[in-house]
Amino acid sequence: MQNLVFVDEAGLNLSMSRLFARAVDGERAVGNIPRSKGGNVSLIGALNLDGLIAAMTVPGSTNTEVFLTYVTQILGPQLWKGAIVVMDNLTAHHAERVRVAIESVGAKVKFLPPYSPDLSPIELCWSKLKQFLRSCEARTLESLDQAMADAVNYLTEDDAFGWFNHCGLFT
């Protein structure tokens, strides 16, 4: 289990806000919700039992070039010989250059079966991370990056262990 590293992408939006609110009985819940839809941002990250080990945000969507940049500049230095990088079946993940970049540091590449996000603990990580980011109400890329830096402390090793356990990786 120590060698498993799950890599995935998540879509974010700069107009994300809390989904639920509470108020004193008889009072109306009040909060700020942007009127216009903000820009889309892709979050690429890697999760192991220590937590979120490598994350990068990019405006717009992810393609092979963006993912290759993530692998070579962000993920690669965090990997070790014997690491097993587990990814879903996004087209960018199957690029030969991506496989070569990961294997050049001594790691192996494995793919999840099609349509099986329930086997990937990073999906649960994204859920908790998005909840945190909604509460931060980041409206610019800079504030989103700062919120991401704060989120690394918000996600604990106990969370990661629980997500791995929930996905059946300890049975």
Residue ranges and their predicted role:
Residues 1-4, 122-171:
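C-terminal anion-handling pockets and recognition modules
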Residues 1-72, 169:
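Extended, low-complexity cationic-aromatic segments
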Residues 6-8, 45, 71, 88, ...:
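Mobile genetic element proteins and their domesticated derivatives, centered on retroelements
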Residues 6-7, 83-87, 111-113, 165:
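Short beta-strand segments
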Residues 13, 62, 85-98, 114-119:
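Acidic, metal-coordinating catalytic cores used for nucleic-acid/nucleotide bond scission
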Residues 29-35, 105-124:
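RNase H-like polynucleotidyl transferase catalytic core
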Residues 66-84:
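Short, basic/hydrophobic alpha-helical segments
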